[in-house]
Amino acid sequence: MQAVNIPDWYIQSCERVQYLFPKAHAVAYVLMAYRIAYCKVHHPKHFYASYFTVRATDFDYTHVSKGSHYIKNFIKSVYQQGFRASVQDKSIATYLELANEMIERGYEFEKVDLYKSHPTKFLITEKGLRPPLASLAGVGNNAALSIAEARDVNNPFISREDLRQRAGIGKAVIERLADVGVLDDLPESNQIDLF
């Protein structure tokens, strides 16, 4: 290294530390942090939609649908448990912190909708974000994709039974969708009551 005029201090540092964090690598981290912060401040709905779609793999709509008070209490209880808290609860608390921040900034999570929700991505709406079908616990990506393929605005589902048959999903998924109110407008079966 001395043959190519590397300073002595650098050679000694390499001998002591064995590895120095490259400046270019550090700059790349800083630039990325700056870009993320810029998006969070100037394009908040896009930031939150991207974050929840990509990072929050454990996202469960039922947690955010219960409101800000529930979210704060859940986060508080996880922190109070400390090391005793489960890994899943810690993961949920992480995305709930960001969900709470989003709500505090005046945006909201709209209701999951059978026809308007994307199967796997958060959609930007006028009020905030619309969670995907897969954000419901018990409704996996495959079931959400099957529902998206089966739905047709020109030929809406006439019943829960019709949804189950056309999408090829099980009763458990139907029950999960019904539990959170996604199927409130759909009758149980294709049969029509005359009296």
Question: What are these model-derived regions, one by one?
Answer:
Residues 1-195:
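Noncatalytic, beta-rich nucleic-acid-contacting surfaces in large DNA/RNA-processing enzymes
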